[in-house]
């Protein structure tokens, strides 16, 4: 009954820039970033046990995150995601909340949770200390795995940090590699400076 088809998408660096175009960046970027975080942390002394989870069924009920929280029993949650970049043709400048190359994005609130105030403040202070640009957004039309994890047990302090990405959920997404590198630097610094308590 019909012919199966798939998009013919390949990885591209855009015209000598640091912008990258590829498929399925939501949330391959998060998985790739976590791998790089673990590599960076292996040579840095810190008191924390760090877990990374590539979950399933986020878009249909945060199901994998719920299971992961029950298995891991986390003390905090740093959800690493894409953030919808709004610097696209056709939008007025005042409507642009998140832009490529502007730094990682700290989500203040989405439809599934409000980021923990103390953890948010710690990330903002760490970004200032490390001279890392940081953008902010709200996303009232969707949520992330943090929306399930923050409700685990007595509650888990949670935030969402995203890499600005254009055209998520399409055949090609676009992100700026500087944002990726800055997210990596920020998250490594945050994890390193968190105490074990």
Regions found by a protein language model. Give the residues of each.
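Alpha-helix C-terminal capping segments
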Residues: 39-43, 70-72, 150-155
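Active-site loop ensemble at the mouth of alpha/beta enzyme cores that anchors a bound cofactor
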Residues: 74, 91-106
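Short, well-ordered secondary-structure micro-motifs
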Residues: 62-66, 87-92, 147-148, 171-172
